[in-house]
């Protein structure tokens, strides 16, 4: 069996890792072992935060919808319940966009949600 020399592959692997680690401070961008360790952590953080970002955006959309719904005299909870009962299938992302960019359309959606709710839910809290 022939002897395999690894010089070319090893240098390429190390060069690639150091190129990926450029921009880090100190030894983490200059020494292979430190750079490799940092890159493994970086990949982990990257994976976690890609998934965390989805929840962050959902929270942002809910906050925007809630603010717009309260400006129209309704809470987020009742608004979403009313839309579901009315059969309106618009996701939170689009609702948040409508709330920010088109207040008149959002007011129509609030009216639709309010009409779909049972009568006792629409009554003020003091009269229940």
UniProtKB/Swiss-Prot annotation:
Give the species.
Answer: Micrococcus luteus (strain ATCC 4698 / DSM 20030 / JCM 1464 / CCM 169 / CCUG 5858 / IAM 1056 / NBRC 3333 / NCIMB 9278 / NCTC 2665 / VKM Ac-2230) (Micrococcus lysodeikticus)
| Name under which the protein is recorded | Large ribosomal subunit protein bL20
* Gene Ontology MF annotations: rRNA binding; structural constituent of ribosome
Which Pfam family would be a valid example here? Ribosomal_L20
Mind listing the GO biological process terms from this record?
ribosomal large subunit assembly; translation
Concerning CDD domains, the annotation shows: Ribosomal_L20
Q: Which UniProt keywords apply?
A: Ribonucleoprotein, Ribosomal protein, RNA-binding, rRNA-binding
Q: What is one cellular component GO term in this UniProt entry?
A: ribonucleoprotein complex
User: Is ATP-binding there in the keyword field?
Assistant: no
The family annotation for this protein states: Belongs to the bacterial ribosomal protein bL20 family.
Q: What's the stated role of this polypeptide?
A: Binds directly to 23S ribosomal RNA and is necessary for the in vitro assembly process of the 50S ribosomal subunit. It is not involved in the protein synthesizing functions of that subunit.
Report which gene this protein is encoded by.
Answer: rplT
Q: Which PANTHER family match?
A: 39S RIBOSOMAL PROTEIN L20
